[in-house]
Amino acid sequence: MSINIVLEEIKGTPSSIIPLLSILHNDKQILSTITKTELNHLISRTLNLVRSSDVYNKWCGINLIRVIVEEYSILASEGNNLMNSLLQVLEAYQQQQHHHHHQTTIDLKILTSCIETINYMGDLIRGKPTLTREILTPKLNSIIGYYFQYLHFAPLLILNSLQTLLKFHPTTFRPFGNKLKTKLINLIDGGGGEEFINYPQDLQLSIYNTLAMLPIIEKIEPETKWYNDVINILGEINGLIQIYQEFLNFKDDQDLSNLIQKLPNRPTTTTTTTKLLTDLSIDFNKPQTILSISNHLNILMGVLKSYLTVETLFTVKLPLGLILTTCELICSINTKFLSFKGDIRDETIKKLIKFSLIENYKTTLGVLIELIELYKGSLIPHLTTIWSFLETLIPFQNQNKRIVNEEIIESESLYVEILQFMKQSLSLLGNVSENTQLLRFVDMALILVEPRINPTTTTTTTNNNNNNNNTKQTNVQQGKKQKKRKNTSSVALSDILSHEHLFMTNIPTITITTVRSFINQIITKIILPPTQHYKIMRYLIIESIHAKYYNLYHNVPIELKKLLINAVLYPGYDKISILPIISTILSDDPLLGVFNNPKFPPLPKYINLVNNIEEEEQKEEQEEDAIIEDEVEEPIKEELTTPLKKRKLDIESNEETDNNNIIPVEDQSKIFTATKVEKLTTTTTSSIENNPVVIEELTSSKEIVVESPVDEPTKVDNIIPTTTTTTTTTTSLTSNTANANDDNDNDDDDESSDFEMPEINLDQDSDDE
């Protein structure tokens, strides 16, 4: 689409501006390729629309500015002119006179469009130093002033805009800080807070957030200003709560007085701090004024909540202990533990006081939920204390400590918020070892999801039965004969017995969702006693069957499906498995299929490490013994198989010693198999004579006579050779191993020789001498 079509359309009153705005917004090429002449025509015709007295033309011109400033080149070159035209709309439009009523009016559509466009241009300019310095900063004072002036026309939009200016331009906003705070307090305290409580929730929240952001404009120590504001709010809450001393006996609970002493005092008129709310005036002749206590507490806790949640540009010190003490103080004011004073006799006033306390509990739960959502793990050390004072809010009978179902249903929203806080607090924990503190919350949750019969139906049935009984008693007393007539009153009541499901009331969706989420946390985090466990299992099974077979697709809701699977994964003390029932309900679930048809891997073979080590040691010892035996047996076998050779060599060695000649050892491998002998010397004749080796005398024919036959060899224990070595008689196996490579040439001779040099026993010789 060409830019000429757009220029032609906005030349006068546009017939339809929406397609043009859509095209310019989506097709960025149109504005990025625009020529200088076309840009001048576009800007001039847009400004003509903005200056037009016609509301439609003005609205078209304002929204056209919002679209064309998306192109940076247009924003940089024409942003100043466009911003001035928008400010002129804010300045001059309220002076327009309404033609019919002649009143000063302002069109909200033009106002909101103009403010939104200014905010949009500010967001585009902010962060770009040159544009901010040239366009935005010089006009901030005018923008803030106009926003203050039109605050009552569009409070929500203008307050959100002021929050943005506070955050990004605190220095420029500083002169307007006190003025804005005064305006906000007037809005809050208007009509004693009775008017403010009827504002929309989003507008109330915007006022709270704007008030909480004001410390950001402080030049010196803004964090101190923030902390002092929080302390003043807590002190104002403390003073407000003490009003209940006029109705209840605080002396019945000593801990209550201790909590009051821990909190800061209420700001007085002599202090420099400004109170948010004025003093209350309660008149027993106007019981509804009692509810103003709850309204004021709601406002103060709302401001406190905003101080805790709104982001700041500086680090603050959060008085978490004082905040939790304030919550405990509010929840401790309970008519179950505190008696009414003697002058409070009217039941209406008592009911209003109880209702006011319940509203206070709801407000406190809102702050606790915000705290645990924002600060999470920081509240874990305080969870036991919080659970304790929340448990006191559950109504129960003093005799048997049973929970009162009627009061639970009447204040359903309060107990739903309690369960919501419990769910979020349990989600922060991995496991809860002590479950006694949570049992009442479980019972309360199950009461909230029990089937409910319309209370008016049961009341009608009871009243009719009482009337019938009274009529019978009257007739008997008067002696009248009762006529048999049809009981018409029982006809309609018979439907209650036959079609009870038609008289059931629906449980709110938020209640069901909260209870199921709480039960899911309970199942996975703690082990319940059998009573509570079976109650939960019964509820889950009934709800799942009802949900599956009473809908079109026969599907179980996701939240119930998770609950059923967790019930299988975390059985607790359950002795009887509910897996068959749940498998029937969730027949196609793959996780339950693993439980029903397990495919286990091969069982591991457990090995006793101690026995294994002992067996290995025994095997090693046996192998070593076998090696030693083989080494010992081999030379013995060789000696026994060749006794003739040994004896012949002994005789030859004796003859050689007589000549006292040194015999060089040429073939060492034939003499020693395990050692290497480098040098061999002869011994003296006397040592040879003492040698215990028995040698038979040689006959003339020089035949050797052997005493024992060869077939039956005897073991020779000690054979002492006739030769000794001068250097080393027997070298170690290490030397033999080291020189093994040198003796490779003699390996063939060793294999053919069976002789081994016996060990020389020198001790034997010395004894014989």
From Swiss-Prot:
Record carries keyword Nucleus: yes
Pfam families with a match to the protein in the record: RIX1 (PF08167)
Keywords from the UniProt entry: Nucleus, Ribosome biogenesis, rRNA processing
Composition-biased stretches (Acidic residues): 742-769
Biased composition (Low complexity): 456-479, 722-741
GO annotations of cellular component type: nucleus
Principal place of residence: nucleus
Region feature (Disordered): 456-488, 715-769
Keyword rRNA processing in record: yes
Subcellular location: Nucleus
GO biological process: rRNA processing
Matches recorded under InterPro entries: RIX1_N
Family: Belongs to the RIX1/PELP1 family.
Function summary: Component of the RIX1 complex required for processing of ITS2 sequences from 35S pre-rRNA and the nucleoplasmic transit of the pre-60S ribosomal subunits. Regulates pre-60S association of the critical remodeling factor MDN1.
Quaternary structure and partners: Component of the RIX1 complex, composed of IPI1, RIX1/IPI2 and IPI3 in a 1:2:2 stoichiometry. The complex interacts (via RIX1) with MDN1 (via its hexameric AAA ATPase ring) and the pre-60S ribosome particles.
Name of the protein in its database record: Pre-rRNA-processing protein RIX1
Protein source organism: Candida albicans (strain SC5314 / ATCC MYA-2876)
Gene that encodes the chain: RIX1
